Every structure is written in C-alpha cells, then in structure tokens.
A protein has these predicted regions:
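A conserved mid-domain beta-alpha-beta active-site/ligand-binding segment of alpha/beta enzyme cores
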Residues: 125-151
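GST-like domain detector, emphasizing the conserved glutathione-binding G-site
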Residues: 1-129
C-alpha cells in the first residue's frame, strides 16, 4: 500500500518547500517504503484528512494518520522495524530529538528571517493573502531587517 505524504507547496505544485516535509520524504525513502507526495497549498492544510492537523507533514498509511515529522519518523521506525533504521537504536532517538530542538531554537529563527519573504513570494496569490494576513507583523520586521542590510 502506498503511503501518502501531504507536502507543502507554493504556486508550483512540483516544488515542495517545507523542510519538515523533506525530513519525512527522506525518512520514507531511507526506509525504502512506497510513498507518494500529495502537493498541498498553504490554504488547503486545514482541510487535510478532514482537519486532522493544523500543520503538515501528515502521512496516511492505510488507516493510520500521523502528523509532525518526528512523530512520523517514530511511527515509521515502530511500524517498519525490518526496514533500515532511522535512529540506530534508543540512543539515536534522544540524539535526534536533541538536534531537532537545538535547530528549532538556534537555526530556525534565523532561517525564518532569511527565507520568509522568498517563501511568501513563491506562494499562489490566494495563499499569499492568507499568509500575509496571519504573518504581517512578522513580515514587517523581516522587511525592515532586509532593507537595513541592503543599503
């Protein structure tokens, strides 16, 4: 059975851009599982699988629905133990969780500042309007920081 991965896309459905979805795609590929990307625009996320999660990635594996890239990796590890491991054992789970948390606290804020406007510009117009309404306060700070560095 093919596992469905709901994958965040912008105006071009062939170019998924979420690093969290990429982590899941890489996990599925590493496990050698049969999977298919379901291109999902920003405004369609709330409707994925009947509103199962506010965010993606989400996978559907038969009757199972799992959200969050780390939870998905744990699910894949537990459900497909005969496939290559993602963590290399219990110690690897803790190490992976540490790296995830560290990157969320130290790298993600910077990457968000650097990439947010580029991501916004690559969204479909309807998605841009919704994203702008929800992130205008953040976008204005990013615009100010960007223009200050480009003088």
């Amino acid at each position: 059975m093919t596992i469905l991965l709901y994958d965040l896309v912008g105006a071009d459905p062939a170019r998924p851009f979420s690093p969290h979805c990429w982590k899941t795609a890489l996990s599925l590929a590493h496990k050698g599982l049969d999977w298919q990307s379901v291109p999902t625009p920003f405004t369609s996320v709330p409707a994925v699988e009947g509103g199962f999660s506010k965010t993606i990635p989400v996978i559907r594996d038969g009757d199972a629905l799992v959200a969050d890239s780390f939870a998905i990796a744990r699910y894949l590890e537990d459900t497909y133990p005969a496939q290559p491991t993602l963590f290399g054992g219990a110690g690897g789970v803790g190490g992976a969780r540490f790296v995830e948390r560290w990157s969320q606290l130290t790298i993600h804020p910077y990457l968000g500042t650097v990439a947010l406007l580029d991501i916004h510009d690559r969204l479909a117009p309807a998605d841009q309007a919704v994203a702008t309404a929800g992130l205008e306060h953040w976008l204005s700070a990013v615009r100010a920081a960007r223009s200050a560095t480009r003088r």
